[in-house]
Curated annotation (Swiss-Prot):
It comes from Shewanella sp. (strain MR-4). Belongs to the UPF0235 family. This is UPF0235 protein Shewmr4_1190. Pfam families: DUF167 (PF02594). GO terms for cellular component: cytoplasm. Transmembrane segments: none annotated.
């Protein structure tokens, strides 16, 4: 399974999340997943909300276009981004 898949104009990301990091960033590959560090703690859905906001900003889409498909309660997540207007360089290289 690939970390990043383009499906019918949507982007499907298999992510490994590192909560409580010093800053928000796309770290790179972590096995067959893309590692994303976020500053929010994994308490009461704060990390998921922060992840959605961070990805929406990175891909220049509304938060409503970022859907967590799998992994609501874990570090391993599958996220769909509907019709991204921008693809960060770290992810664009994985699509090639």
């Amino acid at each position: 399974m690939s970390a990043v898949i383009m499906q019918q104009g949507d982007l499907l990301l298999n992510l490994y999340i590192q909560p409580k990091a010093s800053r928000d960033q796309i770290v790179g590959l972590h096995g067959d997943e893309l590692k994303v560090a976020i500053t929010a703690p994994p308490i009461d859905g704060k990390a998921n909300a922060h992840l959605s906001k961070y990805l929406a900003k990175a891909f220049k889409v509304p938060k409503s276009d970022v859907h967590i498909l799998k992994g609501e309660l874990g570090r391993h997540k599958q996220v769909r981004i509907s019709a991204p207007k921008n693809v960060p360089a770290e992810i664009a290289t994985l699509l090639e």
